[in-house]
Structure formats: C-alpha cells, structure tokens
C-alpha cells in the first residue's frame, strides 16, 4: 500500500507519541548497536541535531558520546534555523546552547560550517520509505540544506520504525537518505 507524506506524518507522529520512556531508551540502545557497525574513521565533520525529548526523538546525544569516545578527532556541528527565511546553517558545537523560538537547542552562532565540509549528517525524521525518502516535520529545512551541501555527504536517518511503503508524493526537491538505521536493521539507499 502506498501512502502520501502527510498521511505518513500523521501515523508516525501518533506512533511516536505513544512510545513510553522505557521503550525509547531500549530502542536508543538498539540504535547504538547498529551505529557501532559503521566505520567512522573517514568522518571529520558530523552534523547532528539536538533531540526533542517531548517528541520522543532518538537520543542523538547518546550516539555522539559513543562516537566521540572512539573517534575524538570528529568535530560535531548543529543547526541554527532562520525562521524568517526558512533556511538553516550548521555551526560547530559550543559548550553552552540557546533555545530557539520552537524551544529547540542550538549552538551559539560563532563558527559557521561550510556545507562542503560536512562529511556525514544525522538527518531527523519521523519515518522513511523503501527508497530512502524521509518524512520529517514538513518545513523542508533539511531538504533545502542538503540540496546546497552537494553529493558527497552521507545522509544517515535514525528511526525507531521500519520503512513504510513508498511515498506517493515525492518530488525533485526531496533529497533521499544514503542510509537509515532502525533498532533492528540498517538500510542502504545509494
């Protein structure tokens, strides 16, 4: 059965909202096991995002702690969203963070990262389909950023759920993932 992204967003938002804290913690541990299978040795700059606990997002901070321990040379950066222009840029992490208008943590805007410097990116999502198209929160920030970042970036989705059937309404502006990790599998798309 095929589904459009709006329907998928609704279904996946409900599924994620129904997760308990214990279920999220267990799935984060399983996601970490999948992430340990990735060779991070060629990554120099990894773009990530601060998880929204109230939205039951995967705990990227747990994943980063693991990566930083084994690969201390990797530099992490995080997005700052410009709501007025619907654009987003990444900045190297800072010890202190600020909250944006949506209540999302952001680094202080000191060291902007050129898109071509990012090797790998954790891409937030609600879910994904069998071709690597993601469904996010519907604002298009990541698709716009990835379009200007170029082809070389590894786009890794991290999902609590397995892929859905293919979305019926993808278009040329949708940037597919390189891979997506779930608690039970890793899916490669490129």
Regions found by a protein language model. Give the residues of each.
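Conserved phosphate- and dinucleotide-binding cores of soluble alpha/beta proteins
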Residues: 84-190
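N-terminal active-site beta-alpha-beta segment that forms phosphate/nucleotide-binding
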Residues: 2-99, 103-109
């Amino acid at each position: 059965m095929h589904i459009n992204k709006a329907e998928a967003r609704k279904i996946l938002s409900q599924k994620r909202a129904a997760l308990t804290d214990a279920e999220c913690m267990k799935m984060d541990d399983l996601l970490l096991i999948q992430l340990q299978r990735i060779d991070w040795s060629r990554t120099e700059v990894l773009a990530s995002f601060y998880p929204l606990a109230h939205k039951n997002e995967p705990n990227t901070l747990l994943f980063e702690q693991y990566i930083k321990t084994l690969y201390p040379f990797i530099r992490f950066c995080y997005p700052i969203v410009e709501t007025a222009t619907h654009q987003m840029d990444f900045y190297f992490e800072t010890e202190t963070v600020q909250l944006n208008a949506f209540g999302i943590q952001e680094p202080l805007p000191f060291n902007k990262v050129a898109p071509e410097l990012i090797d790998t990116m954790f891409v937030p999502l609600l879910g994904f389909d069998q071709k690597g198209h993601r469904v996010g929160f519907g604002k298009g920030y990541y698709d716009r950023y990835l379009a200007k970042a170029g082809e070389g970036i590894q786009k890794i989705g991290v999902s609590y759920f397995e892929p859905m059937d293919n979305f019926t309404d993808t278009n040329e502006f949708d940037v597919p993932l390189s891979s997506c990790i779930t608690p039970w599998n890793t899916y490669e798309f490129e």
